Amino acid sequence: MPFTEPDRLFSRITRIDIQRDIVALGYTSVLLDIDNTIFTRDTHEVPRDVGVWLGRARDAGITFCLVSNNFHEGVYQLAQRLDLPIVAKAVKPLPPAFLFARHKISAKRATTLVIGDQLITDVLGAHFLGMCAYMVRPLVEQDLKHTLLLRNVERFFIGDMQPEEGCSCEESTF
């Protein structure tokens, strides 16, 4: 897989089959983006199906650490609500935040997966450290201006790569 492409692309996080796409491949830890991956920018809610998916993944033995470039109080509140460790102000794609997140959950590179909605921050950050990266389509289309610019760059690298479809957890609001 080229450095500038996700290892796998999914339409949303709930389409990642926990057993087939994570556990069976030997991943025990996930470094997880927040904004537009598990948390909507427009409503500031974790959709119910995403909450269900996170619960099922934890039940399967997956350890999570949230990794976000965001620095607002809301990301810390979300981490507390989900009972997950967090590395905020991450400055992704730079390696230190990913290394610190791995350290926080005692994760090894080979068994750690990164999941996020942006190529430039999440995928490149993972690949800089030799970790696998799954990219998901953003939960909502509404984005900040600088994120819209990055999405245009993503289209250049990803081209017409189509998302995989896997399981589906019930949809609603968590």
Segments (PLM) and residue ranges:
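Asp-based, Mg2+/Mn2+-dependent phosphohydrolase catalytic module
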Residues: 1-32, 39-44, 48-174
